[in-house]
Amino acid sequence: MKLCYHNHDFEFEKIDGKNKLDILYDETTPEQLQSEIDTCWARVGGEDPAEYVKKYTGRAPVVHIKDYYGSKSENMYGLIDSGDSDKKEEKTSENSPFEFRPVGYGVQDIASLLKAAEEAGAEAVIVEQDRPSMNKTPMECAKMSIDYIRSL
């Protein structure tokens, strides 16, 4: 069994010039904690997600490949289940410039992310989309992601 930490964008905020996620990994050993890099949130947090995945080679058994369109905004947190039902209701993809997209339909360089995951020794790559978009159903979005990855 491995304990992995799944990031969001706020772990890339800096403390004394170093991002919080790096501090977490510096303060633990790979035996204690592995990374589970979510490439969408890494990019939203200001990092190059492919380079960030490679930074934790040997400590990245799981990598989340996730695409999006738009820019960071306060409303984007309403697109994930934060457990705060009041905020979820008011923050939707209709009023947010940020939107999760099927893989290959957003701003991410998916080929470089897959290559980075392989180079880092990832045992699993998870294709994730928190919410459907582009007026598609969840199954249509999943098929779009699968078809895009197969085209690479």
What are these regions (language model features)?
Residues 1-2, 41:
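Structural motif corresponding to the early beta-alpha repeats
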Residues 2-12, 17-20:
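Conserved anion-binding
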Residues 15-37, 41-152:
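Histidine-acidic metal/acid-base catalytic patches
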